[in-house]
Amino acid sequence: MRRFYSLLLMVLCCTGLFAKTKKAVYIIIDGVPADQIERLHTPAIFDIASRGAYGRAYTGGEIGGYSQTATISAIGYTNLLTSTWFNKHNVGGNSDLKPNYNYWTIFRIAKEQPKEYKTAIYSSWTDNRTVLIGEGKKETNNLKIDYVKDGYDLDTVRFPKKEKDLHIFDIDEQISKDAAEGIRK
């Protein structure tokens, strides 16, 4: 099994970076090896990282160990969002998703704090919010995400299918624009 590295960028307390309010930004980039991001030294990511932190996250688990996990999107996202492996969070693929909501996501942890925190998600896939995070489900205490931009994979009018799935680039561009606008507010 090929080792897969997912890029995880965490920025904590970015005072004055894009907005007047301190913000934590957690970015998951699927399918782009961290060494490529580092080799290209992408300006936007490293500008943010210079004022916060940058780190790699390995989402495949230990090969041959109890934590070994397939490197499929939903599994990896849930590994990162819950800080647990598949054997606990129960997301074993990209379909027939049945998360174990006893393992809280970073969104639920933020919302359950005594201090009020605003949350946002910018994603191509609605299931990241409605299923993996469990927005509105009784099992997640009816978790509510404050700012939502997702579901672009279902919008075939704005993002018609292109050869070699190049419409995904258009969707990613829109998500990036939405996120940048939201962070600046």
List where the protein language model places each region.
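Hydrophobic alpha-helical membrane-insertion segments
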Residues: 11, 39-40, 132
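Boundary/entry segment of secreted carbohydrate-active catalytic domains
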Residues: 23-28, 36
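Active-site-proximal beta-strand/loop segments in catalytic clefts of secreted hydrolases
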Residues: 27-32, 59-61, 84, 122-127
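Bacterial Sec-dependent N-terminal signal peptides
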Residues: 1-22
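Active-site nucleophile/metal-coordination loop of metallo-enzymes that catalyze phosphate/sulfate
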Residues: 20, 34-115
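His/Asp/Glu-rich, glycine-adjacent segments
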Residues: 82-185
